[in-house]
């Protein structure tokens, strides 16, 4: 049997496989030994039991008995109870005082008006003396009394009034009358109305160029063919076959399916 090289299957660090007795993975020799919680808990229990045994020995010794007798003579147990009771009472009294002070403070705040409604003294404004130079006052001239006349200015004003006479009736007719009566009172839309003797003005323009080429004149020996209009195909809607009964209507919607033919043959 050939030897199988298991080193190729082992994990590698570069080109070196982690396989052999030189490196034991997962044992207590890895990184100084494995950490065990059971050993820690057993160590704590051993330490507690040793302290308990030492305390029992000290309590049951002669020194412990003398200490207990001395404490009993001094009523140490009663003093401890009284101290605890006084401490609890003191804590309760302090809590009651703090609660009463808080209640009194809230009552005083409710009786007093809010700060916004209290009359605050106006702020003191520092008076600063500033010398302002006012412009000199213009003295208006005294008004003349009723008996005195108003002095005239140096330049006298003359008022010239020009009067124009209205034009005569004939001149107004010549200037404003239109030569012909108008159809509409609006100036931009008005057109003059001509009499019967006037002739309409026409523009002499050349005849228009025909867009369709002229047809040749027919001769005596040839028959004239009339132009025929192009035929236009009109799409007519297909009529749906109407069934005589509901079965034919259903067959037209669903279909008849595969047609089958039954024949009886004798052999």
Swiss-Prot record:
Annotated GO biological process: lysis of host organelle involved in viral entry into host cell; microtubule-dependent intracellular transport of viral material towards nucleus; viral release from host cell
> What is the protein's name according to its record?
Pre-protein VI
Pfam families in the record: MCPVI (PF02993)
Region (Involved in endosomal membrane lysis), start-end ranges: 36-53
**One GO CC annotation:** viral procapsid
Q: Where is this region: Disordered?
A: 107-184, 199-230
- Ranges of Low complexity composition bias in the record: 218-230
Query: What does the UniProt PTM comment say about this protein?
Result: Ubiquitinated by Nedd4 following partial capsid disassembly; which might play a role in intracellular virus movement during entry.
Q: Which residues form a coiled coil?
A: none
UniProt motif PPXY motif: location: 166-169
**Protein encoded by which gene:** L3
Checking InterPro entries in the record gives: McpVI (IPR004243)
Organism whose genome encodes this protein: Human adenovirus F serotype 40
Motif Nuclear export signal, chain ranges: 67-76, 248-259
> Is Protein transport a UniProt keyword of this protein?
no
Q: Where is this region: Binds to importin alpha/beta, involved in hexon nuclear import?
A: 257-267
């Amino acid at each position: 049997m050939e030897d199988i090289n298991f080193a190729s299957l082992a994990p590698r660090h570069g080109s070196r496989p982690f396989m052999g007795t030189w490196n034991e993975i997962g044992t207590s020799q890895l990184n100084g030994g494995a950490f065990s919680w059971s050993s820690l808990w057993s160590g704590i229990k051993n330490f507690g039991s040793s302290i308990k045994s030492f305390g029992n020995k000290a309590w049951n010794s002669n020194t412990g008995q003398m200490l207990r007798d001395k404490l009993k003579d001094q009523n140490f147990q009663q003093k401890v109870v009284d101290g605890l009771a006084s401490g609890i009472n003191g804590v309760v009294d302090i809590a009651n005082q703090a609660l009463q002070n808080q209640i009194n403070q809230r009552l005083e705040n409710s009786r007093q008006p809010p700060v916004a409604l209290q009359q605050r003294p106006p702020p003191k404004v520092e008076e600063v003396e500033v010398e302002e130079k006012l412009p000199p006052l213009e003295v208006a001239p005294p008004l003349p009394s009723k008996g005195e006349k108003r002095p005239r200015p140096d330049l006298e004003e003359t008022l010239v009034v020009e009067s124009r006479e209205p034009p005569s009736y004939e001149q107004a007719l010549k200037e404003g009358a239109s030569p012909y009566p108008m159809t509409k009172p609006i100036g931009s839309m008005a057109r003059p109305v001509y009499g019967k003797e006037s002739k309409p003005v026409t523009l002499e323009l050349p005849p228009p160029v025909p867009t369709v080429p002229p047809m040749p004149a027919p001769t005596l020996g040839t028959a004239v063919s009339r132009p025929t209009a192009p035929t236009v195909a009109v799409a007519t809607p297909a009529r749906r076959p109407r069934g005589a009964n509901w079965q034919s209507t259903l067959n037209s919607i669903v279909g008849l399916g595969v047609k089958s033919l039954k024949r009886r043959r004798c052999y």
